[in-house]
From Swiss-Prot:
<feature type="disulfide bond">
    <location>
        <begin position="46"/>
        <end position="58"/>
    </location>
</feature>
<dbReference type="GO" id="GO:0005576">
    <property type="term" value="C:extracellular region"/>
</dbReference>
<comment type="function">
    <text>Inhibits trypsin.</text>
</comment>
<dbReference type="Pfam" id="PF00299">
    <property type="entry name" value="Squash"/>
</dbReference>
<dbReference type="InterPro" id="IPR011052">
    <property type="entry name" value="Proteinase_amylase_inhib_sf"/>
</dbReference>
<feature type="disulfide bond">
    <location>
        <begin position="52"/>
        <end position="64"/>
    </location>
</feature>
<feature type="disulfide bond">
    <location>
        <begin position="39"/>
        <end position="56"/>
    </location>
</feature>
<keyword id="KW-0646">Protease inhibitor</keyword>
<keyword id="KW-0960">Knottin</keyword>
<protein>
    <recommendedName>
        <fullName>Trypsin inhibitor 1</fullName>
    </recommendedName>
</protein>
<keyword id="KW-0732">Signal</keyword>
<keyword id="KW-1015">Disulfide bond</keyword>
<feature type="site" description="Reactive bond">
    <location>
        <begin position="41"/>
        <end position="42"/>
    </location>
</feature>
<dbReference type="InterPro" id="IPR000737">
    <property type="entry name" value="Prot_inh_squash"/>
</dbReference>
<dbReference type="GO" id="GO:0004867">
    <property type="term" value="F:serine-type endopeptidase inhibitor activity"/>
</dbReference>
<comment type="similarity">
    <text>Belongs to the protease inhibitor I7 (squash-type serine protease inhibitor) family.</text>
</comment>
<keyword id="KW-0964">Secreted</keyword>
């Protein structure tokens, strides 16, 4: 996120901002293709572990993590 803020201050073009925003998605997709499973940083409400994406579990706060 710090890289995004610094680029925005420097007057980054739309292409640079799109690349910065999409990098996280690309990294997660690549890890899934490699078989490495990590819980994405997406707020998803849950009641049981099955409500969450692969690699996540339902936490006591009612969200996947």
């Amino acid at each position: 996120m710090a890289a995004f803020v610094e680029s925005a201050r420097a007057g980054a073009g739309a292409d640079e901002v799109i690349q910065l925003v999409s990098d996280g998605v690309n990294e997660y997709s690549e890890k899934m293709m490699e078989g490495v499973v990590a819980c994405p940083r997406i707020l998803m409400p849950c009641k049981v572990n099955d409500d969450c994406l692969r690699g996540c579990k339902c936490l006591s706060n009612g969200y996947c993590g």
